[in-house]
UniProtKB/Swiss-Prot annotation:
GO molecular function, one term: large ribosomal subunit rRNA binding
Entry function: Forms part of the ribosomal stalk which helps the ribosome interact with GTP-bound translation factors.
Keyword rRNA-binding: yes
Pfam family, any one: Ribosomal_L11
Alphabetized UniProt keyword annotations: Methylation, Ribonucleoprotein, Ribosomal protein, RNA-binding, rRNA-binding
The record's account of how the chain is modified after translation: One or more lysine residues are methylated.
GO CC annotations on file: cytosolic large ribosomal subunit
Coiled-coil region list: none
A GO BP entry: translation
Name this protein carries in UniProt: Large ribosomal subunit protein uL11
Keyword tRNA processing annotated: no
Length: 142
C-alpha cells in the first residue's frame, strides 16, 4: 500500500546552500521532518548546479515523517537576469528598458526549462520566456 501523504511543501532554496535556518528549518520542522537529512540530500542533488542559484523544490511529506523531494529548474526571471547581466527587472517595464537578451539566449533558457514549461514545442516555450523578458523590461533582439 502507498504511503499516506501528510503535506506538500514548496520552497525556493539556493543550490548547494540548504541549511536549517529559515525558510527551510521552520517549514520542515512544522511537519516533523529531519531537517539535516533534507539539507544533505538537497545539497548533494544540486552539486552540479551553479552555487547560490535559487532552485524551486517540492517536498512531499508522508504520515510516517519520511519525505521525498523533486527539484525543478531555476525561475525564468533569474535566468533572464543572468543572461542580460542586470541585478533586477524594470519598475516600469513598458517605459524603462534595463537590458537586452538575444533570441539565442532565449532559446537556450527555453531548452533549459523545457522539463518544467508547458508548451507544444521549443518555439512556444520561447514565446513564454520572451513574454517574461518583456514584463521585466528586457528587450529581445535577433
Amino acid at each position: 500500500m502507498a504511503k499516506k501523504v501528510q503535506a506538500y511543501i514548496k520552497l525556493q532554496v539556493a543550490a548547494g546552500m540548504a541549511n536549517p535556518s529559515p525558510p527551510v528549518g521552520p517549514a520542515l520542522g512544522q511537519q516533523g521532518v529531519n531537517i539535516m537529512e533534507f539539507c544533505k540530500a538537497f545539497n548533494a542533488k544540486t552539486e552540479s548546479v551553479e552555487k547560490g542559484l535559487p532552485i524551486p523544490v517540492v517536498i512531499t511529506v508522508y504520515a510516517d515523517r519520511s519525505f521525498t523531494f523533486v527539484t525543478k529548474t531555476p525561475p525564468a526571471a533569474i535566468l533572464l537576469k543572468k543572461a542580460a547581466g542586470v541585478k533586477s527587472g524594470s519598475g516600469k517595464p513598458n517605459k524603462e528598458k534595463v537590458g537586452k537578451v538575444t533570441t539565442a539566449q532565449v532559446r537556450e533558457i527555453a531548452e533549459t526549462k523545457a522539463a518544467d514549461l508547458t508548451g507544444a514545442d521549443v518555439e512556444a516555450m520561447m514565446r513564454s520566456i520572451e513574454g517574461t523578458a518583456r514584463s521585466m523590461g528586457l528587450v529581445v533582439e535577433d
